UniProtKB/Swiss-Prot annotation:
Comprises two domains: an N-terminal domain containing the nucleotidyltransferase activity and a C-terminal HD domain associated with both phosphodiesterase and phosphatase activities. This is Multifunctional CCA protein. It comes from Escherichia coli (strain SE11). Its cofactor is Mg(2+); Ni(2+). Monomer. Can also form homodimers and oligomers. The keyword tRNA-binding does not apply. Belongs to the tRNA nucleotidyltransferase/poly(A) polymerase family. Bacterial CCA-adding enzyme type 1 subfamily.
């Protein structure tokens, strides 16, 4: 029996990145031998065991053979005669097909070290094409390591295009697509994930609402980048700089979906695109089974982001009604989320990357003023039932009006 550290732990250590999870491969052993040594078996489809002390995963070396469609259609073979090289060959990318023995020596049968040095994401073997999930995984790795200068090897991108063209992605479940997307949204450069999907044709299959934005023009006066798809990825990039939250980043990604519905004869204007985009947000989220909280914020951002841009023009009643509409009294975090997504929208434009966004500050200030109006005083004044809410709203509007007169510049 020989034990090797494999995969991501080896890769990230060589890149000088923090190692989170460690996975091990056991060569020359059997399930019974592992159980006798005190390991606990957890894998049902193939033999994976938990170490009795560290609880890290130890898998018997195995090979995989395609036996059906999609990413689950594989038959595994695990036996003492399966070599380390056999096991590493089934992995997706060469930089993930690295192993380290107990002396610290790196075993690299597929030139993963060379690709690591050259910052290349390259598939190990043609078997890559048998698993459609790998298209999403490579896009996610491209996003995760973009800041280190990694790019996808030409032959790997070509294979990803072929897989997409042959309909392999249609076998992916919504849950797996969302899981990979959610993970990509946590990276430093989530926009790279969607750009890679577009480069291989997968965006059209998995995110048609986003793909439809490319080639749709916006007024050059407001959008020097012109193309709404490019603007969408620029805003996502900006959102990633402004917030680590997945819901903020996803909402930013979806903020302009309504522009894809504008008839070409009305281009480059997109009047009413915000509310129009709400149904597309709902459609996308229902298809991918996006969690409700994330979906709800995306709907609100699509509907109201343009309203925030015009904040100095809003009357106090409209501002308080906005807080009602986003349910800010129960979910106050939405004010900050809406401020961040709206700022990302403005700064996600060519030449505006460092622009100030005072509307975000005014929104936050108005919220502090509105929420500081005490409910207790209204009750103590003798108001009852529905009158309490009406009087509370009236006082909030008055407070915001007073603040706006002093702090918010009047529109020209």
């Amino acid at each position: 029996m020989k034990i090797y550290l494999v995969g991501g732990a080896v890769r990230d250590a060589l890149l000088g990145l923090p190692v989170k999870d460690r996975d091990w491969v056991v060569v020359g052993s059997t399930p019974q031998e592992m159980l006798d040594a005190g390991y606990q078996q957890v894998g049902r489809d193939f033999p994976v065991f938990l170490h009795p002390q560290t609880h890290e995963e130890y898998a018997l070396a195995r090979t995989e053979r395609k036996s059906g469609s999609g990413y689950t259609g594989f038959t595994c073979y695990a036996a003492p005669d399966v070599t380390l090289e056999d096991d590493l060959k089934r992995r997706d990318l060469t930089i993930n097909a690295l192993a380290q023995d107990d002396n610290g020596e790196i075993i690299d049968p597929y030139n993963g070290l060379g690709d690591l040095q050259n910052r290349l994401l390259r598939h190990v073997s043609p078997a890559f094409g048998e698993d459609p999930l790998r298209v999403l995984r490579v896009a996610r790795f491209a996003a995760r390591y973009a800041h280190l200068g990694f790019r996808i090897a030409d032959e790997t991108l070509t294979l990803m295009r072929e897989m997409t063209h042959e309909g392999e992605l249609e076998h992916l479940t919504p849950e797996r697509v969302w899981k990979e997307t959610e993970s990509a949204l946590t990276t430093r450069n989530p926009q790279v994930f969607f750009q890679v999907l577009r480069d291989c044709g997968a965006l059209r299959v998995l995110f048609p609402e986003i793909d439809a934005l490319f080639g749709v023009p916006a007024p050059a006066r407001w959008h020097p980048e012109i193309d709404t798809g490019i603007h969408t990825l620029m805003t996502l990039s900006m959102a990633a700089m402004l917030s680590p939250q997945v819901d903020v980043r996803f909402a930013t990604l979806c903020h302009d979906l309504g522009k894809g519905l504008t008839p070409p004869e009305l281009w480059p204007r997109h009047h009413g695109h915000g509310p129009a985009g709400v149904k597309l947000v709902e459609q996308l989220c229902q298809r991918l089974r996006v969690p409700n909280e994330i979906r709800d914020l995306a709907r609100l951002v699509a509907e109201f982001h343009d309203l925030i841009h015009t904040f100095p023009m809003l009357n106090p009643k409209t501002i308080v009604k906005l807080f009602d509409s986003i349910d800010a009294w129960r979910k106050p975090q939405r004010v900050e989320q809406l401020a961040l997504t709206s700022e990302a929208d403005v700064r996600g434009r060519t030449g505006f990357e460092s622009a100030d966004y005072p509307q975000g500050r005014w929104l936050r200030e108005a919220w502090e003023v509105a929420q500081s109006v005490p409910t207790k005083a209204v009750v103590e004044a003798g108001f009852k039932g529905v009158e309490i809410r009406e009087e509370l709203t009236r006082r909030r509007i008055a407070a915001v009006a007073s603040w706006k007169e002093q702090r918010c510049p009047k529109p020209d």
